[in-house]
Amino acid sequence: MKFNVNPQDYSQTYLENLNICFPNWGDMKTFDWVFNRKVTNRKADFFIINSEENELLAGSAISYRKLKFPSGNDHEIGIMTGSWTLPISRGMGCFTETIKKSVEIVQDKKVSFLTAFVTESNASYRRLRDAGSFLVDTNYIISQNLECKKLFNQIEVAVLECNYENLEAVFNLRNKLLQSKIHYDYNFDEFVNQFINRINPTFLIQLGNEFAIVEETPKMFQLHYCTSYSYEIITGIVNWVNKKNKEIIFFSTDKNNSFQNDESFKVIPGFFTILKNEVSNNVDLNSVFSSEIDFDIQYGDKM
């Protein structure tokens, strides 16, 4: 297999293949938002894989963030993003080679870890597990209340202006709430660009003393950030989006969340995977990512 890293004038072809493998993944506006924003002063890297006969097989990208720890220390991480393997090349070991190449790229940039978000049922999870990844339990959670029509306790939802004062208050509250957890670290401008300045309309909402940021996509809402994932707050948000005849998806690194056995929610188990390289070879993952320290990664952190 042959690798071409950051090929010139390849965005449109890369996007076309993403949409072949993941129908309706997005348009060029989506591509630019995912791959061409700078976060932690780095743009995403991407590469393609060709056969020895120059037949296109697969592609993948790496975006960059910082994980911050309760100690105040942080580690820069690469995140496998937008990986695809064309149907003709499945079963050829392309994703295993994608992992190896991704490790090499982040290592060359002196980035400590290569990470990924995978569902438990996906073959990508097994490849990353077998490569030696440290595994953090996650859940994708999708409301199904339009079908179940379960009546939740009502809680008032107020839509706030996305002005500087309100966003700064939520940003500062986020930093306070995450002090004791492992989380993605942003400065204020990065926070706004990550959670507010997205592709579709976003809403900053308040429920009692709690706040949430949601994005309305054509098919459903996405809950990108919330100060509380209590049953009362989440069901209040579900009621609000149901009035618009849509459901909502969110993401949790709390495996003991309240939605596991509720017919109004579909829970899809998965993992946040963390893979070392030569930069972090002496790091004991079980010590750094101690089970005594919780992760808090939310849906809006993921891309």
Regions found by a protein language model. Name each.
Residues M1-E76:
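Non-cleavable N-terminal signal-anchor transmembrane helices
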Residues T13-A44, Q107-K109, D130-E232:
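Amide-forming acyltransferase catalytic core, primarily the GNAT-like/NAT-type
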Residues F31-R37, F95, F117, I293:
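Tryptophan-centric aromatic hotspots in well-structured domains and transmembrane helices
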Residues F47-I48, E55-R65, I79, W84, ...:
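Conserved beta-strand in the GNAT
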Residues S51-N54, E104-S112, A123, F134, ...:
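Secondary-structure boundary elements
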Residues A61-S71, H75-T98, S102:
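Long, hydrophobic/aromatic-enriched structural stretches that serve as scaffold segments
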Residues Y64, F117-E156, A212-M303:
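Active-site/acyl-donor-binding loops of N-acyltransferases
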Residues T85, R90-V106, A116, S230-N242:
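Conserved acetyl-CoA-binding loop-helix of GNAT-fold acetyltransferases
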